[in-house]
Amino acid sequence: KKFIVILFFLSFFSYAQKEYSLNKISSDKIKLDGVVNKSEWADAIQIPLIYEQEPGKNIKAERNTIAYLTYSDEFLFVAFVSFTDPDTEVRASIRPRDNMSIWNDDMFIIRFDTFKDARNNFVFSSNSLGSQFDLRMLNATDDRGKYDSSFNANFISNGSIAEDRYQVEWKIPFSEIPSPNGENQQWNFNLGNRYYKDGKTIELGSQAYDRDNPCEVCQTTDILNISNIKVKKRFELLPYVSASVSGERENIDDKISYDPIERRVGLGINMDFNKTTSLEVTFNPDFSQVEADVTRIDINSAVSLRYRERRPYFSRGTDIVRFSDGAFYSRSISNPSISTKLLSQNSNSRIFFLTAVDQDSPYLVASEDKSYLGQGGQSFVNVFRYQRIINDKARIGMYTSNRYYEGGGYGNLVGIDGLLILNKKWRLNYELFKNFNQEPTKDWIDSSDKIGDRSVMLDGQEFNGDAIYLTFERNTEHWKSYFTYRNISPDYQTDVGFVVKNNRRWGTLRHTYQNIVDKENLRSYEFGTKLDVNYTFDNNLKTISLDGDFQIETIGNTEISYTYDWDIFKNFMGIDFKDLPTSDLNIRSSPTEFFNFNISYEWGKDLAYNEEVPEKGKLKTFSIYASFQINENLNINGLLNYSELKQLETSEYYFSGNIFRLTTRYQFSNFLNLRLIAEKNTFNKSFFIQPLVQWNPNPSTIFYLGGNQNTDLEIDEEIIPLLKFRRSQIFFKFQYLIGLKK
């Protein structure tokens, strides 16, 4: 026994790779019923998850968790069993695929670095009821840039909860895991178990985790050997049919008059040339969103707001075109009639090539303080991206995008970028772009404003600009620091991107201390400061801003954070303002599976940006989100956002209003749900409800039937009853994945 204990503790001081060679079985040996049967998994290797990575620092795991791995010609089989006491609460509910609420559950995780160069990790996870979440983890140090949930793999998962354990079984086709060509594979991998206990989130792993190394994907280093596999090339057809009917009533007492039914059919094709290169083609795609975007308050924004991409075609593979700059924004391609996308990643390179004919082209013009958005006509778009993987510590790339407008005008952008990991603590990111533009001669934007000597109105002018982004980062277990420099010229524009401000030379310095202490009432704490200084290209001071912030994690999985943002000086629309402080308090908590919430409150001084003459005002905003998991099937959540800005000397408002959104979802299974969304917006005096039935058995096959019912709360000074809908739409779509593997 003493010898075993000594060996165990010695393992914590050795971060050496462990190597596993899997045993091969027949595909029909394992019955994927969610119960890990010892006889079925007898040939699998067993890997214990012995490290508690958080909150403990690579200490012995309290909960006994074992993973099982084996494979057949075409599939990788993975199982997890986590042993518990009979009175242990296991968090698990039936969730739709890739729904963020799943991270309130206890989760099993496997990560693959199939190219063994830390370019990314392919992550598969599920809870003990088989609900799935897969993603691509990137080589970044902040959570915003680290996770790409657009990665989707078609795999099978089933799980169950017993008196003394919870468990899950997965069957993953090799064709769904991006990897090098060849029948013999060697990958890096590791395993995880994330669960809740006594008001804390606990993370276990099969490897020790180095908190001094901020590169999480670099720490997936255990070796997995698999031989003589068969990876069939995918040839997939994705036909769809959809229909909708819309109507509107002219007056309150009229019946809704419906237009003729609109019908659409289209086809998608996905084919593999080999294991590393694929082509997608879509004809007459239906990219209507199944779920409405959460409405954001924009009444005091001088620039356009950016929304997350929800269309699977445009989100797949786009991690390679993520830039600090906003050089690529897939939602700038709004209504394509045809599009193609080539994806390729080899042992030392990656390629992304997208083309599209867009029928409705948004046209975004950035300036020093404001942005201008117009709706254009047809355009031809292509985007090309190449990245060279030098090794696990260096990569360089180039990027180009082109947009040619029907009737004249274009926007071309070229650039280079790179990542250099100088050592475990230091890294450098850089992006350099140059644009060449000729405006269309169109009436898409109605404005008499000027940007230097150039009019905002589209009158065929030619211009070009450039942008530079540099970031130095230093990260250790306790200290995180970065310096960012942004140099964006007055005529910089990205026609297939999203840049809303230019004419700035902007430096940011950030320094943070953090510590995981794992005490009864204090799990961790963090505090930091940030300085921003911004000049124009004419060397005029735009902004001096100083922030201070702290964050603690305490009982009940609760995080409390506070930020004091002091704009010492700000110039907006040529007017100088001084002393604009704001405070921001946030509380986020997940005390139980039944209930979690997020509260934020911001107060202080801000500008009324959209007044004819900008002025200071007293700001007050708050947001409350609450989610109730009634049982493993039913979830109800609500979100209330309120914002107001008052004049300093009087009680009059520049603006005041709120948006309330209520979502009810009943999840019959992992694939079938019924959802009802209702939203009331007092800013634009509207109310809508959106009922929807959705069946989604894999990432591509989908059926939904739903509607949109809209009410204008105030028209011609007449108040319409809340459920007296002015506009109505009913729609359905059926899209089915037909796999014709070669």
Which ranges hold each PLM region?
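Sec-dependent N-terminal signal peptides
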Residues: 2-12
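Structural preference for beta-rich elements and adjacent junctions enriched in aromatics
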Residues: 16-387, 397, 408
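A short local loop/turn or secondary-structure capping micro-motif enriched for an aromatic residue
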Residues: 40-42, 85-89, 132, 143, ...
